[in-house]
A protein has these predicted regions:
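N-terminal lobe of the biotin/lipoate ligase/transferase fold
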Residues: 1-82, 184
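Long, positively charged amphipathic alpha-helical accessory segments at protein N-termini or as interdomain linkers
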Residues: 21, 58-86, 96-229
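Basic side chains
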Residues: 34-36, 89, 147
Length: 229
C-alpha cells in the first residue's frame, strides 16, 4: 500500500486516477471535493479525513460495481463502530444518531474503481446549512482523535471487506449490511437519479441482495433516500 499526501488538491478522486489498486490519496483540503449527485463535500481543513482508495474490481458487472459504496460504508462502520452505534443510509452515508459522520463516492476509472471517503473526525462546529445534519467522532465521543490512526483502522477494514466482496460477491455481505441498515422498516422518500422520474415514497423493506433498496416491494437501484414520506 502506498499513501500519497497533499496539503491541498482539487479532488482526491481526481488524484487517484493515476494510481493502482491499493494506492491511497489523502488531502487536508479539497477545493472541489464532491459527493454523490454533484453534492459538495464540506470539510474543515486539518480536522477531518478526506481520501481516496484505488480498488480492484472494475472487471465485475456494472450491477456488482454499483454495490461498492455499500461495501465501503460497511467497512467504515466496522472500523469505527466501537466508538459509537453507527448505521448505513443507502446508498453511501454513514450516520450516528441520524447525523452524517461519513460519505462515500465510488467512480469507475479504467480497470479500477476509486472510492472517495470523507470522515468527520475532529470537527465540532459545522456550517449552519449542515449543522443539524452532521456529526463527528469528536462530537460523539467528547474527545479528539488521531487522524492517522483512524485512517489506518479504516484502510485495514476496507481491505478485509473489499477482499470479501472480490472473493465471494456482494451477497456474502448482505447479512452484515442488513444489521446496520437504518432505513429498513421506515417510511422513506427516494429521489431517483433520473430527473424526469417522480420521487418514490413508501415502506422500506431494506437493502436487497443485489444492493437495491426495496420501497413498497419495488427495487430502486440509484437515488437519494430520506426518512419520511
Amino acid at each position: 500500500m502506498r499513501i500519497f499526501r497533499k496539503e491541498t488538491t482539487v479532488s482526491t478522486n481526481l488524484d487517484a486516477r493515476e494510481g493502482v489498486p491499493g494506492d491511497v490519496f489523502v488531502a487536508e483540503h479539497q477545493s472541489a471535493g464532491r459527493g454523490r449527485l454533484d453534492h459538495t463535500w464540506l470539510s474543515a481543513k486539518g480536522e477531518n479525513l478526506t481520501f481516496s482508495v484505488v480498488l480492484a474490481g472494475a472487471d465485475r458487472s456494472p450491477a456488482e460495481i454499483a454495490t461498492l459504496p455499500l461495501v465501503v460504508g460497511l467497512a467504515v462502520i466496522k472500523a469505527l463502530g466501537r466508538f459509537a452505534p453507527l448505521a448505513l443510509k443507502w446508498p453511501n452515508d454513514v450516520l450516528s444518531g441520524g447525523r452524517k459522520l461519513a460519505g462515500i463516492l465510488c467512480e469507475r476509472n479504467g480497470d479500477n474503481v476509486i472510492a472517495g471517503i470523507g470522515i468527520n473526525v475532529n470537527q465540532t462546529s459545522f456550517p449552519p446549512k449542515i449543522a443539524a445534519r452532521a456529526t463527528s467522532l469528536a462530537a460523539i465521543c467528547g474527545r479528539s482523535f488521531n487522524r492517522d490512526e483512524v485512517l489506518s483502522d479504516v484502510l485495514e477494514s476496507l481491505d478485509r471487506w473489499h477482499g470479501k466482496w472480490l472473493a465471494e460477491g456482494f451477497v456474502s455481505l448482505h447479512g452484515d449490511l442488513a444489521a446496520v441498515d437504518c432505513l429498513r422498516g421506515r417510511t422513506v422518500c427516494v429521489r431517483q437519479v433520473d430527473d424526469d422520474a417522480a420521487p418514490v415514497s413508501g415502506f422500506c423493506g431494506g437493502i436487497a441482495k443485489d444492493g437495491s433498496l426495496i420501497v413498497d416491494g419495488r427495487p430502486i437501484y440509484a437515488g437519494e433516500a430520506h426518512i419520511g414520506g
